[in-house]
Amino acid sequence: MTKARVAWGVSIALLLFAAGVGLYTVFVHDHCSGYSFISPDFACSPAMPHAWYVGLKASLDAYVAQATDGGVSEVAVYYRDLREGTSVGVNATNDFSPASLLKLPVVLAIVSIAERDAAILTRELPYDKGSLDAEFDIPAAINFDNAGNTLEDGKKYPVEDLLRATLVYSDNYAYFALLKFINYDYPGGTQEVGRALQELGVIDPRDPSEETVSVRNYSGIFRILYQAAFLDADNSERVLRWLVEATFKEGLIAGVPASTPVATKFGERVLDGEAKQLHDCGIVYHPQNPYTLCIMTKGSDWAGLKETISEISALVYKEVDSRAQ
């Protein structure tokens, strides 16, 4: 298959991804059964003071204003409490290039197919580094530990191994092998992935040709995973475990204690030769109060973008930790 056909396959995946609509799930639990259309986990949890969220919003506003005065051109932040559902955002609907963030919803779509066709996970696919141009390589400035990635060029690997490498190492070669397979070699794969991606609803369906994403929409994927509302419980746990194993440590993870698990996916993109975008989104498993946090940035310097993400992560964790005491 030529690189042009692979690129076309990627475009199909992106267009399918862009056609998303919302996902609605009813939650009913014995301990709080008076609600039919909202999550009783939220309704029955002790409410946190409104002033706390106002304070967090003010702190984030101040930090973002300072960061954009100091060389970072744009920052967006979205925080959501996973116990009660309250959220705080700064520039939460601004559009960014999704870049490698797209890997997560595509992985979820393929795993959802595997829930009906388990044999897909053992199907072996070629791992071919010659299938991509150098422009798809992750910049050296984005440091992450790739030593554990044992996939070798020219060999074949099960789909499950490629799915894991796509999330743990953000492996572009594994990702494009999956896209090629699902678009060309799996009967009805394009349509099945399309239906799955529609349920995730993370890109504005009013303009499906736009390959853009906001912190608010993208962070919804992690809430859906946390609630096992898209995949079953076992597969939700499996995907989140892969995300916790992710080897990019200079974003959200750098802002929290080393003992705190973080299920994270980062994305990076260089536009017009100089303009850079770096994003990191995920679930921070604070021991008393887990939350989602999604941060997207634009600027001219990788170091400044990484620092911005890690400092916002630290700010939010400190605020959550102080509330939990």
Task: Briefly describe each language-model feature range.
Residues 64-71, 108-118, 129-131, 167-173, ...:
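Sec/Tat-exported extracytoplasmic proteins
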Residues 104-109, 217-220, 311:
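Short amphipathic alpha-helical face segments that pack within enzyme cores
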Residues 251-254, 260-264:
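His/Asp/Glu-enriched short active-site or ligand-binding loop at hydrolase and phosphoryl-transfer sites
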Residues 3-67, 87, 185, 226-249, ...:
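Structured C-terminal helix/loop/strand segments within mature extracytoplasmic catalytic/sensor domains
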Residues 37-56, 125-238:
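Active-site-adjacent helix/loop patches that line small-molecule binding or acyl-intermediate pockets
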Residues 80-84, 93-95, 112-113, 130-132, ...:
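Solvent-exposed coil/turn segments that connect beta secondary-structure elements
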